């Protein structure tokens, strides 16, 4: 699957400090320690109702990760998937009277357009579930062979499930207790009451073919992949075990990321799926959770059609720390627009205060668990000094503009 167009990054003199990120599994901020090439997998969209601000906040988070790693001298092998085979997609297509493939293609193209407008650096590999079905089939065969998976006793629909007890460390990523897992499993696409399962928390690996649903051939019977196994297969086949960062929204911690890791660790024993599990907070609207069911999604494409500068959307989302749940309001957007205007006014000056210390602080704050609020404040301080008192460094405005572009993804 084709990604979106790349964005040229300005070169900022020197190199940024090593990146430190909060690891959900370890419950602490610790160094990211990649080799020359950093490896990162981020869970992509299910292509309907794209791209709302919750999506945007997640992909901006990992865009910052990408930029900070590059600024630190690393190449970045970034993989992102698209869940273009899933029940919510089929349900939306049926509701709207369109083919699910047509709906998926349309929403994926809109997502690409939104990401390019927000100046999100594209993944090196952008992989759809449909194009990776054969990989999933091979993965399920391995899980069946080593006893980590089983077929339910159902002659009509012999679905294949993952044994939750296949790994001793299951649950290490989320740290949730059994009661919390049971509640979230039911709320987030699980099927705890499916007859024939050995444990209510066992997760679907392969859904046997049903009338009216798409299916693909497999040695164990035609069907389609479960949700979690798609990411396990795509990530392992492109990045290998113990890649540097798995990322997504905090609503993916459980069940999706917990099971993706468990599937992989059942095949590659003794090695963690990823070295860092990193999760972005959720975005609400005017004091309420933003969700499809509430009908209060704010779409990037709608804001763009209304004439909102994508750079302001980006600044508005970066004004809160990535790990915190936060609200989108008119006041947030107005503040972002005002900040963008001030930054552009200051960097358009013929001279300004020296830029070196500001760029160093910008780098340091971003390397410290992506502290974007402090990073924005560092630029604000330079801008205020430039507008209020001027300066004699003729290269400073351009240097600040290039650093803001390269590190924050905001073109001034």
From Swiss-Prot:
NCBIfam families: mycothiol_MshC. Disulfide bonds: none annotated. It comes from Nocardia farcinica (strain IFM 10152). InterPro entries: Cys-tRNA/MSH_ligase, Mycothiol_ligase_MshC, Rossmann-like_a/b/a_fold, tRNA-synt_1_cat_dom. GO terms for biological process: cysteinyl-tRNA aminoacylation; mycothiol biosynthetic process. The lineage of its organism: Bacteria, Bacillati, Actinomycetota, Actinomycetes, Mycobacteriales. HAMAP family: MshC. Zn(2+) binds at residues 43, 231, 256. This is L-cysteine:1D-myo-inositol 2-amino-2-deoxy-alpha-D-glucopyranoside ligase. One of its GO terms (cellular component) is cytosol.
């Amino acid at each position: 699957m084709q990604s979106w167009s790349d964005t040229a990054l300005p070169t900022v003199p020197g190199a940024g400090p090593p990146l430190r990120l909060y690891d959900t599994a370890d419950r602490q901020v610790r160094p990211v320690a990649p080799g020359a090439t950093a490896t990162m997998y981020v869970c992509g969209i299910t292509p309907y109702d794209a791209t709302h601000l919750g999506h945007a906040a997640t992909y901006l988070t990992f865009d910052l990760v990408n930029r900070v790693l590059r600024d630190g001298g690393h190449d970045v092998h970034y993989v992102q998937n698209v869940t273009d085979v899933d029940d919510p997609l089929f349900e939306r297509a049926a509701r709207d009277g369109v083919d699910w493939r047509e709906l998926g293609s349309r929403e994926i193209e809109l997502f690409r357009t939104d990401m390019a407008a927000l100046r999100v650096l594209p993944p090196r590999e952008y992989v759809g579930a449909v194009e990776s079905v054969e990989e999933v089939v091979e993965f399920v065969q391995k899980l069946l062979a080593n006893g980590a998976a089983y077929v339910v006793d159902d002659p009509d629909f012999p679905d294949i499930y993952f044994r939750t007890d296949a790994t001793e460390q299951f649950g290490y990523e989320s740290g949730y207790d059994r009661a919390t897992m049971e509640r979230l499993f039911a709320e987030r696409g699980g099927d705890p009451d499916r007859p024939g399962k050995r444990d209510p928390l066992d997760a679907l690996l392969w859904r046997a073919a049903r009338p009216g649903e798409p299916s693909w051939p497999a040695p164990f019977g035609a069907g389609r992949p479960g949700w979690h196994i798609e990411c396990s297969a795509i990530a392992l086949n492109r990045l290998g075990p113990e890649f540097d960062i798995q990322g997504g929204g905090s609503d993916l911690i459980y069940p999706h990321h917990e099971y993706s890791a468990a599937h992989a660790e059942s095949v590659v024993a003794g090695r963690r799926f990823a070295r860092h599990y990193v999760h972005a907070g959720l975005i609400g609207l005017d004091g309420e959770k933003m969700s499809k069911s509430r009908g209060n999604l704010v779409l990037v494409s709608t804001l763009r059609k209304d004439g909102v500068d994508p750079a302001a959307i980006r600044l508005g989302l970066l004004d809160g720390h990535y790990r915190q749940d936060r609200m989108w309001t008119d006041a947030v957007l107005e503040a972002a627009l005002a900040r963008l205007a001030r930054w552009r006014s200051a960097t358009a000056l013929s001279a300004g205060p020296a830029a070196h210390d500001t760029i160093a602080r910008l780098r340091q704050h971003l390397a410290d668990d992506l502290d974007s609020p402090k990073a924005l404040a560092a630029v604000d301080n330079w801008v205020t000094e430039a507008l209020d008192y001027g300066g004699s460094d003729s290269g400073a405005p351009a240097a600040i503009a290039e650093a803001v572009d390269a590190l924050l993804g905001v073109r001034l």
